[in-house]
Amino acid sequence: MTINNINSFIDHTQLKPEATPGQIEKLCQEAIDYKFKAVCVNPVHVNLAANLLKDSEVEIASVVGFPLGASATDVKEYEAKKAVEHGASEIDMVINIGLLKNEQDMEVIEDISSVVNTVPVGIVVKVIIETCLLSDEEKIKACELAKRAGAHYVKTSTGFSSSGATVEDVKIMKKTVGEKLGVKASGGIRDLETAQKMIEAGATRIGASKSVEIVKSQSN
């Protein structure tokens, strides 16, 4: 199965701590040139990305509580609010993994819903569940809680833990959330074949830093 227009699935990503303004400018220009769905950047780069992309259709995703998810809920709220003020149209927040593992379901829901309710209606909230740290049962629970909390997407990984997206995890997540939520696969997706497998498994968005190489290989 060949996925046409794979660029429209891609969040072109630059989250390295050493990322410079020049690299963000390059990221945004590539997003315009290749018509990627979004760029995904750290909060400090949202304002620059918003200025660079203001005349384009490219969405701007800011990470929140990244990469550990261990920030206090009100800090995540503030971070999300400021990101939107600076031009973000999407928020990729990290779930509180410790609370999830401790089966503190209501606290996990509150952590997510607080961010969902802090940002204006129309802002897309993706919840990163960090699949590599979870059992299959915990992956299912995380997706169920994200859905109950009003999130719009569940996302596999930060790309900063022990491993990234797998086809098996995407299938589990898609089966759990159904058509109500999107599924974003991210972490370790470096080639066209892997990206296509993730989409076939149910991913509706792909997070990648090798986006240009992926798209170029599709056109070859």
Curated annotation (Swiss-Prot):
UniProt cross-references to InterPro entries, sorted A to Z:
Aldolase_TIM, DeoC, DeoC/FbaB/LacD_aldolase, DeoC_typeI
- Give me the Gene Ontology terms describing cellular component: cytoplasm
Which cysteines link up through disulfide bonds? none
EC code: 4.1.2.4
Q: Which Pfam families match?
A: DeoC
What does the similarity note say?
Answer: Belongs to the DeoC/FbaB aldolase family. DeoC type 1 subfamily.
Q: Which residues form the active site?
A: D92, K155, K184
Q: Name one GO biological process term.
A: carbohydrate catabolic process
Which pathway features in its UniProt record?
A: Carbohydrate degradation; 2-deoxy-D-ribose 1-phosphate degradation; D-glyceraldehyde 3-phosphate and acetaldehyde from 2-deoxy-alpha-D-ribose 1-phosphate: step 2/2
Q: Per its UniProt record, what SUPFAM superfamilies does this chain match?
A: Aldolase
Primary localization: cytoplasm
Known catalysed reaction(s)? 2-deoxy-D-ribose 5-phosphate = D-glyceraldehyde 3-phosphate + acetaldehyde
Q: What does this protein do?
A: Catalyzes a reversible aldol reaction between acetaldehyde and D-glyceraldehyde 3-phosphate to generate 2-deoxy-D-ribose 5-phosphate.
Name by which UniProt lists this protein: Deoxyribose-phosphate aldolase
The UniProt keyword set, sorted, is: Cytoplasm, Lyase, Schiff base
Q: Which domain of life is it from?
A: Bacteria
Q: Where is the signal peptide?
A: none
Name the enzyme's class: lyase
Which compartments does it reside in? Answer: Cytoplasm
